[in-house]
Protein backbone atom coordinates (compact mmCIF):
# COMPACT_ATOMS: atom_id res chain seq x y z
CA UNK A 1 0.00 0.00 0.00
CA UNK A 2 1.27 3.47 -0.88
CA UNK A 3 1.55 6.48 1.36
CA UNK A 4 -1.01 9.29 1.64
CA UNK A 5 0.20 12.80 2.46
CA UNK A 6 -2.18 15.50 3.64
CA UNK A 7 -1.36 18.93 2.22
CA UNK A 8 -2.73 21.97 4.02
CA UNK A 9 -1.94 25.56 4.86
CA UNK A 10 -3.79 28.74 5.59
CA UNK A 11 -5.71 31.22 3.50
CA UNK A 12 -2.79 32.85 1.63
CA UNK A 13 0.29 30.79 2.48
CA UNK A 14 0.70 29.38 -1.05
CA UNK A 15 -0.85 25.93 -0.78
CA UNK A 16 -2.16 26.13 -4.37
CA UNK A 17 1.34 26.93 -5.60
CA UNK A 18 2.76 23.89 -3.80
CA UNK A 19 -0.15 21.76 -5.03
CA UNK A 20 0.74 22.69 -8.64
CA UNK A 21 4.42 21.88 -8.04
CA UNK A 22 3.48 18.43 -6.72
CA UNK A 23 1.36 17.69 -9.79
CA UNK A 24 4.08 19.01 -12.13
CA UNK A 25 6.45 16.51 -10.50
CA UNK A 26 4.08 13.74 -11.64
CA UNK A 27 2.63 12.93 -8.21
CA UNK A 28 -1.14 12.34 -8.05
CA UNK A 29 -3.11 14.79 -5.94
CA UNK A 30 -6.77 14.66 -4.91
CA UNK A 31 -8.23 18.11 -4.21
CA UNK A 32 -10.94 18.35 -1.53
CA UNK A 33 -12.37 21.53 -3.09
CA UNK A 34 -12.83 19.79 -6.46
CA UNK A 35 -14.32 16.75 -4.68
CA UNK A 36 -16.78 19.06 -2.89
CA UNK A 37 -17.97 20.40 -6.26
CA UNK A 38 -18.18 16.94 -7.86
CA UNK A 39 -20.41 15.44 -5.16
CA UNK A 40 -23.11 18.10 -5.68
CA UNK A 41 -23.14 18.16 -9.49
CA UNK A 42 -26.49 17.90 -11.28
CA UNK A 43 -27.94 14.39 -10.99
CA UNK A 44 -25.93 13.40 -7.88
CA UNK A 45 -27.47 12.03 -4.70
CA UNK A 46 -25.69 14.84 -2.85
CA UNK A 47 -27.54 17.53 -4.80
CA UNK A 48 -30.88 15.70 -4.45
CA UNK A 49 -30.44 15.62 -0.67
CA UNK A 50 -29.50 19.32 -0.53
CA UNK A 51 -32.61 20.24 -2.56
CA UNK A 52 -34.80 18.04 -0.34
CA UNK A 53 -33.62 20.00 2.71
CA UNK A 54 -33.09 23.54 1.37
CA UNK A 55 -35.75 23.62 -1.36
CA UNK A 56 -35.67 24.22 -5.12
CA UNK A 57 -34.75 27.91 -4.68
CA UNK A 58 -31.10 26.92 -4.24
CA UNK A 59 -31.01 25.71 -7.87
CA UNK A 60 -30.15 27.76 -10.94
CA UNK A 61 -32.39 27.61 -14.03
CA UNK A 62 -30.24 24.82 -15.53
CA UNK A 63 -30.70 22.60 -12.46
CA UNK A 64 -27.21 23.13 -11.03
CA UNK A 65 -26.49 24.36 -7.52
CA UNK A 66 -26.68 28.11 -6.93
CA UNK A 67 -23.59 28.35 -4.72
CA UNK A 68 -24.01 32.05 -4.00
CA UNK A 69 -27.59 31.54 -2.79
CA UNK A 70 -26.66 28.51 -0.67
CA UNK A 71 -23.67 30.40 0.73
CA UNK A 72 -25.93 33.25 1.85
CA UNK A 73 -28.29 30.83 3.63
CA UNK A 74 -25.63 28.86 5.52
CA UNK A 75 -23.55 31.93 6.39
CA UNK A 76 -26.41 33.22 8.54
CA UNK A 77 -27.64 29.92 9.98
CA UNK A 78 -25.36 27.59 11.96
CA UNK A 79 -27.90 24.74 12.00
CA UNK A 80 -28.26 24.83 8.20
CA UNK A 81 -24.49 25.05 7.79
CA UNK A 82 -24.10 21.92 9.91
CA UNK A 83 -26.80 20.16 7.88
CA UNK A 84 -24.99 20.97 4.64
CA UNK A 85 -21.74 19.60 6.10
CA UNK A 86 -23.60 16.48 7.23
CA UNK A 87 -24.74 15.92 3.62
CA UNK A 88 -21.50 16.77 1.84
CA UNK A 89 -18.59 15.78 4.11
CA UNK A 90 -19.09 11.97 4.01
CA UNK A 91 -19.48 12.14 0.23
CA UNK A 92 -16.31 14.22 -0.19
CA UNK A 93 -14.41 11.75 1.98
CA UNK A 94 -15.68 8.76 -0.05
CA UNK A 95 -14.84 10.51 -3.33
CA UNK A 96 -11.27 11.15 -2.17
CA UNK A 97 -10.74 7.63 -0.84
CA UNK A 98 -12.03 6.10 -4.08
CA UNK A 99 -9.72 8.34 -6.13
CA UNK A 100 -6.76 7.31 -3.94
CA UNK A 101 -7.66 3.64 -4.37
CA UNK A 102 -7.55 4.01 -8.17
CA UNK A 103 -4.11 5.63 -8.00
CA UNK A 104 -2.72 2.90 -5.74
CA UNK A 105 -4.21 0.18 -7.98
CA UNK A 106 -2.44 1.85 -10.92
CA UNK A 107 0.87 1.39 -9.06
CA UNK A 108 1.43 4.85 -7.57
CA UNK A 109 3.51 4.91 -4.37
CA UNK A 110 2.42 8.32 -3.14
CA UNK A 111 -0.85 10.28 -3.24
CA UNK A 112 -1.45 13.78 -1.86
CA UNK A 113 -4.77 14.89 -0.39
CA UNK A 114 -5.11 18.68 -0.71
CA UNK A 115 -7.43 19.58 2.20
CA UNK A 116 -7.62 23.30 3.11
CA UNK A 117 -9.29 22.72 6.50
CA UNK A 118 -7.61 19.40 7.34
CA UNK A 119 -7.09 20.18 11.03
CA UNK A 120 -10.31 22.16 11.47
CA UNK A 121 -12.33 19.25 9.98
CA UNK A 122 -10.41 16.66 12.05
CA UNK A 123 -9.38 14.63 8.98
CA UNK A 124 -5.88 13.72 10.19
CA UNK A 125 -6.82 10.02 10.27
CA UNK A 126 -7.23 9.98 6.45
CA UNK A 127 -3.51 10.51 5.87
CA UNK A 128 -0.18 9.00 6.92
CA UNK A 129 1.73 12.29 7.17
CA UNK A 130 0.80 15.97 7.09
CA UNK A 131 2.63 18.75 5.24
CA UNK A 132 1.84 22.38 6.04
CA UNK A 133 2.70 25.20 3.64
CA UNK A 134 3.90 27.99 5.91
CA UNK A 135 4.65 31.70 5.65
CA UNK A 136 4.97 34.27 8.40
CA UNK A 137 1.60 35.69 9.49
CA UNK A 138 2.80 39.10 8.17
CA UNK A 139 3.44 37.66 4.68
CA UNK A 140 0.11 35.83 4.78
CA UNK A 141 -1.74 39.07 5.59
CA UNK A 142 0.09 41.06 2.89
CA UNK A 143 -0.54 38.40 0.21
CA UNK A 144 -4.22 38.07 1.09
CA UNK A 145 -4.78 41.84 0.98
CA UNK A 146 -3.06 42.05 -2.43
CA UNK A 147 -4.61 38.90 -3.93
CA UNK A 148 -8.22 39.57 -2.89
CA UNK A 149 -8.03 43.37 -2.77
CA UNK A 150 -9.13 43.38 0.88
CA UNK A 151 -8.73 45.92 3.66
CA UNK A 152 -6.46 44.91 6.52
CA UNK A 153 -9.52 44.38 8.78
CA UNK A 154 -11.31 42.10 6.27
CA UNK A 155 -8.14 40.12 5.60
CA UNK A 156 -7.49 39.64 9.33
CA UNK A 157 -11.08 38.50 9.85
CA UNK A 158 -10.67 35.87 7.14
CA UNK A 159 -7.35 34.65 8.55
CA UNK A 160 -8.73 34.51 12.10
CA UNK A 161 -11.67 32.32 10.99
CA UNK A 162 -9.16 29.45 10.60
CA UNK A 163 -6.60 27.86 12.89
CA UNK A 164 -3.42 29.99 12.95
CA UNK A 165 -0.64 28.98 10.55
CA UNK A 166 1.95 28.64 13.34
CA UNK A 167 -0.32 26.23 15.22
CA UNK A 168 -0.83 24.21 12.02
CA UNK A 169 2.95 24.10 11.52
CA UNK A 170 3.41 22.73 15.06
CA UNK A 171 0.89 19.95 14.36
CA UNK A 172 2.47 19.00 11.01
CA UNK A 173 4.97 16.23 10.31
CA UNK A 174 6.70 18.42 7.71
CA UNK A 175 6.67 22.16 6.97
CA UNK A 176 7.33 23.75 3.58
CA UNK A 177 8.58 27.31 4.07
CA UNK A 178 6.97 29.39 1.31
CA UNK A 179 8.11 32.72 2.70
CA UNK A 180 10.88 33.30 0.14
CA UNK A 181 11.41 32.55 -3.56
CA UNK A 182 9.44 30.01 -5.61
CA UNK A 183 12.74 28.29 -6.44
CA UNK A 184 13.40 27.65 -2.75
CA UNK A 185 9.86 26.37 -2.27
CA UNK A 186 10.14 24.02 -5.26
CA UNK A 187 13.44 22.64 -3.96
CA UNK A 188 11.75 21.77 -0.64
CA UNK A 189 8.81 20.13 -2.45
CA UNK A 190 11.08 17.94 -4.61
CA UNK A 191 13.27 16.99 -1.63
CA UNK A 192 10.14 15.97 0.27
CA UNK A 193 8.81 13.85 -2.62
CA UNK A 194 12.16 12.02 -2.93
CA UNK A 195 11.81 10.80 0.66
CA UNK A 196 8.87 8.69 -0.47
CA UNK A 197 9.31 8.08 -4.19
CA UNK A 198 12.64 6.77 -5.38
CA UNK A 199 12.40 7.48 -9.13
CA UNK A 200 11.11 11.06 -9.14
From Swiss-Prot:
> Which of this chain's residues are annotated to bind ATP?
12-17
- Which species is this UniProt entry from? Listeria monocytogenes serotype 4b (strain F2365)
| Catalytic activity field | 3'-dephospho-CoA + ATP = ADP + CoA + H(+)
Q: What does the UniProt keyword field contain?
A: ATP-binding, Coenzyme A biosynthesis, Cytoplasm, Kinase, Nucleotide-binding, Transferase
Gene Ontology biological process terms in this record: coenzyme A biosynthetic process
What Enzyme Commission number(s) does the record list for this chain? Answer: 2.7.1.24
Task of the protein: Catalyzes the phosphorylation of the 3'-hydroxyl group of dephosphocoenzyme A to form coenzyme A.
Q: Residues in domain DPCK?
A: 4-200
Single GO term (MF): ATP binding
Q: From what superkingdom does this record's organism come?
A: Bacteria
Q: Where in the cell is it found?
A: Cytoplasm
Entry's family note: Belongs to the CoaE family.
Show the PANTHER family listed in the entry.
BIFUNCTIONAL COENZYME A SYNTHASE-RELATED (PTHR10695:SF46), DEPHOSPHO-COA KINASE-RELATED (PTHR10695)
Q: What taxonomic classification does the UniProt entry list for its organism? A: Bacteria, Bacillati, Bacillota, Bacilli, Bacillales
Instruction: Return any one Pfam family short name.
Output: CoaE
Q: In which pathway does it act?
A: Cofactor biosynthesis; coenzyme A biosynthesis; CoA from (R)-pantothenate: step 5/5
Checking InterPro entries in the record gives:
Depp_CoAkinase, P-loop_NTPase
A cellular-component GO term for this protein: cytoplasm
Stated name of the protein: Dephospho-CoA kinase
